[in-house]
Each structure stands twice: as structure tokens, then as C-alpha cells.
From Swiss-Prot:
InterPro entries found in the cross-reference section: P-loop_NTPase, RapZ-like, RapZ-like_N, RapZ_C
Annotated keywords: ATP-binding, GTP-binding, Nucleotide-binding
Top-rank taxon, per record: Bacteria
Record-given protein name: Nucleotide-binding protein PSPPH_4154
One annotated GO molecular function: ATP binding
Residues holding GTP: D60, A61, R62, N63
Disulfide bridge positions per record: none
Positions with a binding annotation for ATP: G8, R9, S10, G11, S12, G13, K14, S15
Family assignment from sequence similarity: Belongs to the RapZ-like family.
Function comment: Displays ATPase and GTPase activities.
Organism: Pseudomonas savastanoi pv. phaseolicola (strain 1448A / Race 6) (Pseudomonas syringae pv. phaseolicola (strain 1448A / Race 6))
Transmembrane segments: none
PANTHER family reported in the protein's UniProt record: RNASE ADAPTER PROTEIN RAPZ
Amino acid sequence: MRMIIVSGRSGSGKSTALDVLEDNGFYCVDNLPAGLLPELAERALINTELAEPLLAVSIDARNLPSHLTRFPQMLDEVRSRNIQCDVLYLDADEATLLKRFSETRRRHPLSTADRSLAEAIRDETTLLGPIIDLADLKINTTHLNLYQLRDALKLRLLNKPEPGTAFLIESFGFKRGMPVDADLVFDVRCLPNPYWKPELRDHSGLEQPVIDYLSVQPDVEEMFQDIFAYLNKWLPRFAASNRSYVTIAIGCTGGHHRSVYLTERLGQVLQQSLKNVQVRHRDLS
């Protein structure tokens, strides 16, 4: 049986996550009291109507504070039943959450006449502390639109063919912000930039003209070898420490050329020695 617990601050994308999971065969329960988590898992295990039990629940700040405090104990109880249980935590920066609430005009679950929206958002972080500390996967949705979030959720949650550590190698552009959910970040802005070649500017690191240009640059090859040597040595140690997810981010200025090229190459070579290696290009449209 597989269970995914979805949590996060209000406005971060929890409803979208449940929709994606439901569309892919998960039985979903929204706003489950954390104290009922073990009982729900037990009932799902003995339910003969579920050919392959796939269960997703959202637990967030709408819970009683006392239930959230007990979340670590509830999670241990579920996992003691030999259930593969992953905790997904979604978040976004405060300015983005404020903007989303302003656009939808929805009321924050913690807001009151005496508590501003900004205060409610900050208080929510404190309440969810026990879940944040135990999250297996954290996804920051600040720079993701609805479709990008759905794609990211499918990639990280549904393309994990077997238990073990799932590695995501992600290209990005610093001009749109660094991925705050990355575990390792490599800055490759010091490398020759195809953007300044007019004939290459409109191509990406996935296309042959850019590949041909970067593949003959000595600094690019040296950077690739150094990053690969580091990852090849240390990623197995991450896997041995029972990490469920590890995100490696490779960043250049715009996220179209150098980081894309290196991310693709690293993904190809690491897939030969590691299981569950995924590649994503955040800023390629």
C-alpha cells in the first residue's frame, strides 16, 4: 500500500496536488484530522475493494493544534504497518501567498478580525512545524503556474517506480530565482554563454547547435566532470541515509542554455549507476 500525505500553507497548491493524485488512481481525503491517520490506513489495508491501495490525504492548519503536535507519533504508527508513506509539503513565499489570496478573495483559515492575512500566513508556518520537519519532499510553488505544478507533481510523485531515493536534476535560471527546495545547487554562470552568439540565442541546451558549441568548450567539460565526480561520490550516501527525495539544481542566467545542457548530460550518466533519476528544466517554456 502507498500513502501520500499532502500538507502546506494555504494557497500553496494542496488542492491541485490532491486533484493530480485523484486523477491517477489515488483515493483522496481532504482535511483529515491527524489523529485519524492510523485508523484510515488500517481500514484501507483491509478494504478488499481496493485492488492496489493508493491513498492520499491532506493534513493542514485546519486541524486542531493538538492533532498537529501529535503528527510525528501518528506517522510512526502508519509506517509501522509496513505502509510506504511519503509526506509532501508545498509552500510559496509570503508575497506570492498574499497575492494568491488577494486574487481569489478567499478567506485564510486562520484569519480573524484581530489577525491580518500576513499574520495568519506566518502563524500557519508555526502550526505546521511538526509536518515540515518530517517532509520527505518539499516543493516551492512560487514560480510555478498551475500546469507546471501539475507536471512537477507527476514527475516527483508518480514517476517513482520503486522504493528508494528519487533524484531530480533540475536546470533553472537565476533571473527567476533559485529553487528554494533544492538540496544541492551548482552555479554555472561562469561558463561561456551561448546567448551572446546571435545564431544560438534562440536555441536551447536541448538543441544540437548549442550542444555542439558547449561540448567543445574546455571549461564546460571541466565543470561537467567536477560536478559528476561530486554527485557520483555523494548521491549514493544520500540514498544510504534513507532520504526519499533529493533535488540537484544546476543554474545559469536564464535557464535555457548552459544549465540545460549540463543537466541533460548529468542525468544521462547518473541514470547508469542510480535508480530513480529524473530530469526537469524549470525555465524552458
